[in-house]
Structure formats: C-alpha cells, structure tokens
C-alpha cells in the first residue's frame, strides 16, 4: 500500500518496512531473504531515498544487513541467539503475567480467554493461520495487561524474531494443541488473581519454546 506524504517519508517507510519484516516467515526457510529497493519503492509509492534511509535505520537496529554486491538481507539469528532471546522473553513475560494478575481488568481477561473459544470444538492444528494469530495476540496482550510500559518497550525489538519462531514452532511436534492448553491454564491463573501461578506457568510455557528450539530448530548459521 502506498504511504501518504503528509509525514516524514523516512519514518513512514521505516514503519512500513519494519511491519513487513515482522510479518515475514523469516525462519520458515533457510534461503536468504533479500529486500529489493526498487520493488519496495514501487510498493510504497515513494522514491528510493527514504527507502535507503529507512533501511539504514533498520540496519543500525540489527534487523537487516548489507552484503556487498548482493543487496540488503533480513537478519536471522543463530539457534543460540534465538534460545537466549526466548529466555529473556520468558523473564519479561512472566513478570508481566505477575503484574497482570493484580492489575488487569476482569473484562480484559475475559477477552483474553475469548481468543481461544473458536478452537474449542476443532483442534487448533486444523486452523493454523488463525490460531497462530491468536497465539501472537495472546502473548502481546499479556505484556500490555501488565500495565508496565518498560516491559513492553524491552520486548519490542525481540518481537520480530520471537513471533517468527512461534509461528514455525506451532506447526511442529503437536505444539499447537499443547500451546492452547497452556494458554488456558495461564488465563485461569490470571482470572483467579494467582500471581505466583500465573508467573510460573508463563515462564514454563515460554521456556518450553526454548527447549523445543534446542531440540528441533534448524537454522542457517
């Protein structure tokens, strides 16, 4: 979608490119993912100058990397780096769950449970795209319901990789069904205002993803 010219074109291009990278299946293939300046310029409806400036910002943040005579590529992390990121995420999200147990309005927790209502009658593995989106929304909502902006900010630059890894992992080793059971357990703890249990279940759930990546993850190193 072309971006409007009533704001900084560089900022708009940056936001559009970062959002696009976030939504990419960057760990679903071992092939390098190249970003084409000309194509991006055409798709966003801006000149290549703000595209280059936006890519420079993304490079500084570690999301893309230039390769001489080849172009700009999306950065993918090694297995060790991914596991470390998941461990950090587990610490932050489990604290968010503890805070949410005390702070989150009851209606927001009910809405969190409602995310999974459509998957009660049929296994989530039969609706992977929809369940994957619900899964991502669940984890982002836990962070938001903590009421702690610092936790939200600290997870922002991890999100691109964590989202992509969760999307791939849900399709492996029957993780979708297990994921939903664990989500419902976390929600029950939140609704019971049991901060200790909510924190523990959230930590165990996310560290389970780290263990899965350790066992099953295949990455281009």
Feature annotation, model-predicted:
Residues 76-146, 174, 178-201:
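All-alpha effector-binding/dimerization core of bacterial HTH-type transcriptional repressors
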Residues 1-98, 102, 218-221:
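Short linear motifs at protein or domain termini
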Residues 52, 103-106, 130-132, 151-152, ...:
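Juxtamembrane/interface motifs at transmembrane-helix termini
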Residues 20, 24, 28, 119, ...:
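A short secondary-structure junction motif
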Residues 137-138, 145, 151-167, 211:
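C-terminal regulatory/oligomerization modules of transcriptional regulators
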Residues 160, 164-221:
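C-terminal all-alpha effector/ligand-binding and dimerization domain
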């Amino acid at each position: 979608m072309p971006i409007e010219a009533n704001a900084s074109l560089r900022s708009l291009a940056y936001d559009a490119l970062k959002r696009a990278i976030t939504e990419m299946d960057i760990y679903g293939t071992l092939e390098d993912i190249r970003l084409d300046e000309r194509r991006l310029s055409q798709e966003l409806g801006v000149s290549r100058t703000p595209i280059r400036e936006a890519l420079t910002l993304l490079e500084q943040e570690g999301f893309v990397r230039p390769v001489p005579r080849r172009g700009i590529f999306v950065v993918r992390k090694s297995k060790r780096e991914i596991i470390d990121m998941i461990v950090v995420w587990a610490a932050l999200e489990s604290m968010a769950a503890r805070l949410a147990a005390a702070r989150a309005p009851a209606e927001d927790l009910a809405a969190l449970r409602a995310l999974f209502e459509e998957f009660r009658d049929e296994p989530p593995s039969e609706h992977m795209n929809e369940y994957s989106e619900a899964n991502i929304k669940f984890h982002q909502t836990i962070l938001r319901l903590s009421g702690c902006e610092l936790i939200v900010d600290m997870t922002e630059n991890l999100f691109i990789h964590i989202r992509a890894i969760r999307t791939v992992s849900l399709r492996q080793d029957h993780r979708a069904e297990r994921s939903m059971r664990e989500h419902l357990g976390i929600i029950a703890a939140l609704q019971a205002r049991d901060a200790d249990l909510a924190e523990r279940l959230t930590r165990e759930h996310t560290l389970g993803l780290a263990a899965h990546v350790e066992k099953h993850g295949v990455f281009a190193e």
